[in-house]
Each structure stands twice: as structure tokens, then as C-alpha cells.
Regions:
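Active-site pocket-lining segment
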Residues: 239, 243-301
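Short alpha-helical scaffolding segments that buttress acidic/His motifs in well-ordered protein cores
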Residues: 167-171, 214-222, 256, 289, ...
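ATP/NTP phosphate-donor binding region
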Residues: 1-57, 302-303
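Carboxylate- and glycine-rich phosphate/diphosphate-binding segment that chelates Mg2+/Mn2+
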Residues: 119-228, 328-330
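Glycine-rich phosphate/pyrophosphate-binding beta-alpha loops
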Residues: 111, 219-252, 322-326
């Protein structure tokens, strides 16, 4: 099965995969929309298991939403009902699939790192106004095909948002209670490279070498946070996306300087790793990061997004108490 987004057909990507697989391809689902929602996925899930229950492999082609959708589709309980999966996520309990598929990921953006992680994000914008994260041993990709050529058609806004998502993944893996030497290695390299490459890429969108460097940085950031999970900046971002409509890449990155200020001084070992990203200058790191974001046209104040000071304070307090917020090294301080 091929799971992808509608625009992949116009870009020639869907046809290319269909030609390569020929009769081995059971079918194509190309109705993936940004930020998969419970209401949209429920009928797609039922149709998938009814029509393609016997297929063995899912190929996910697209950005984070396509990869997330594939992971959500590929696991089923005894009753093949999407509601069973959603109820388990909502209750915070275990979902133990009785049937699964193998997954091959082919990212067309350089940001989510989903090609090398087991996580899939699911949104409920209509009933419970929540964000869920699926994370199962079965949803780890079996293989990832990272071809920077597939990212060259990305427009300016998506390139920016994807790159900032990757940067957030890298930094969130550093100020994280689950950090380890392996995640640190990936995170530092990813953060440094993305901060170097992204400003250049924004003025040279068709540069193949820059696209390749961004794709590698995003993959390395994915490897970093696949070890640690994300932390406070992502926890804050969920409300910003659900309630204020902010694209995820902006929502999870505009608070990075503020979160960094909260992180610095909490743990000497984390300060030392952060310093590696900013040429040893930990004291000026938040200001450098603010200047970097502002230079890309990203404001770093809640007020720029229509959020009042009381609302932002409440949002931060709630985020610190959330599952991702509790990964932050300053959450219990």
C-alpha cells in the first residue's frame, strides 16, 4: 500500500512509485491532509482494513502528516475499529495491536524526523480538542529512503517550518531528562547544521546540496528525540496549534529561546552540551537563538500570535505538567 498526500500525484511522485511497484502495489491512499484528525482518519482506517487487510507493507510517502497517517493506519485491534485505538490513546492505556503492517518511510520534507521514529501524531480538533501521540514497537519504520531530491519542490513556508521543527527536536533532546550520550551526539550535530543551513536554504530553495544537508540534519534530529521524546517547547506548541492555528513548525520553535533560558543553569551537564551548539558561549545562546529566529521572520513573543500574558502563563504552567513537559529538566525545579 502507498499512503501519500494529494499533491504527490501532481509532482510525479505517486506515479513514480506506482510504476516501480507495478502489480505488487495493492492500492494507493492519497487523501492525507495536514495534521491528521480523528474525524478524517476514522473512515479511512475502516476502508484500509476492509480493502487492504491482506497487504504486508505500507510505503509512506510525504511529509510528517503522511508518515503519521501511515503509522496510524498500520495497526489494528481485534475489531478493526479506529475508535478502539483512539479510546486507548485518550485513556493513556496500552494499545496492543492484533494485526500490523511493515513500514517503509519516504520523507518529502526535512523536519519531522518521523522517518526514523515510531511516533505518530493524531489530533482531535472537533470533540476533545486534544493531541495524541501513538508510540508502539510495531510503528518503528523498517526502512527509510531519504532522497533530498524529493524536498526540492517544497515552498518557502514549508521549508522554513520543517527546518524549525527539526531544530526544535534537536534542542528539546538536549534539555531533556532522558538525554544520553548518543542522543547528545545526534542533537548537537543536527542543531548546529540546521542553524547553519536553514538561512542559506531560505534564499536558495533549489540548492541540491543545501537540501541534502537539511535532510540529514532532520534525520539526525529524529534519531536524537527518538531516544528522549520532546519536551517543554513541544508541550506548549499543542495548544498554540489547536487553539490559535499556528503551524507546528512555528508553534514548537518560537518559544525555544524562552525555554532555553529556563533550562540554563538547571544542570551543568546539559549546559555543557548546549554550549557545543553555540560555540561555547552559553551565556549569549538565548539571544543568538532569538536573533536566528527573528532573522527568519519568526517572532519569539506570545503576543505576536495574539496570546495575552495571562493566557501564555497558564499555557506554560499546563505544558510543564503535561507528558512532554515533564521531560524538561526544569519541570520539577
Amino acid at each position: 500500500m502507498l499512503v501519500t498526500m494529494p499533491e504527490a500525484r501532481a509532482l510525479g511522485m505517486t506515479g513514480r512509485v506506482e510504476a516501480l511497484l507495478g502489480q505488487r502495489l495493492a492500492g494507493t491512499i492519497d487523501r492525507v491532509s495536514p495534521n491528521p484528525d480523528v474525524r478524517e482518519l476514522a473512515p479511512m482506517y475502516s476502508d484500509f482494513w476492509r480493502r487492504y487487510g491482506q497487504c504486508e507493507v505500507v510505503v509512506a510517502l510525504g511529509g510528517g502528516s503522511a508518515l503519521d497517517t501511515a503509522k496510524l493506519l498500520m495497526v489494528a485491534g481485534e475489531d478493526d475499529r479506529f475508535a478502539t485505538l483512539v479510546d486507548a490513546l485518550d485513556a493513556g492505556g496500552d494499545f496492543r495491536p492484533s494485526r500490523t503492517k511493515r513500514l517503509i518511510t519516504v520523507p518529502t520534507t526535512a523536519g519531522t524526523g518521523s522517518e526514523v521514529t515510531p511516533w505518530a501524531t493524531l489530533w482531535d480538533r472537533h470533540v476533545k480538542h486534544k493531541k495524541y501521540s501513538l508510540h508502539l514497537p510495531e510503528t518503528w519504520p523498517e526502512a527509510a529512503i531519504v532522497d533530498p531530491q524529493l524536498t526540492r519542490s517544497l515552498p518557502h513556508a514549508v521549508t522554513l517550518q520543517s527546518g524549525l521543527d527539526a531544530l526544535s527536536h534537536a534542542l528539546e533532546a538536549i534539555w531533556n531528562v532522558n538525554a544520553n550520550p548518543i542522543s547528545d551526539t545526534f542533537a548537537v550535530t543536527a542543531a548546529r547544521d540546521m542553524m547553519r543551513v536553514l538561512p542559506q536554504l531560505m534564499v536558495s530553495l533549489d540548492d541540491e546540496a543545501l537540501r541534502a544537508q537539511a535532510a540529514l540534519a532532520a534525520l539526525q534530529a529524529g534519531m536524537a528525540f527518538s531516544n528522549t521524546k520532546t519536551a517543554l517547547a513541544h508541550s506548549i506548541s499543542y495548544d498554540m496549534t489547536i487553539r490559535h492555528g499556528l503551524p507546528h513548525g512555528i508553534a514548537c520553535s518560537f518559544t525555544l529561546p524562552a525555554v532555553m533560558r529556563l533550562a540554563i543553569g538547571r544542570r551543568a551537564d546539559r549546559d555543557a552540551v548546549l554550549a557545543q551548539v553555540f560555540d561555547g558561549d552559553i551565556g549569549r545562546a538565548p539571544d543568538k537563538l532569538t536573533a536566528f529566529l527573528n532573522g527568519l521572520g519568526v517572532a519569539t513573543e506570545f503576543s505576536a500570535y495574539g496570546v495575552s500574558e495571562p493566557e501564555s502563563s497558564a499555557m506554560i504552567a499546563a505544558a510543564l505538567d503535561g507528558p512532554r513537559g515533564r521531560n524538561f529538566i526544569g519541570a520539577t525545579a
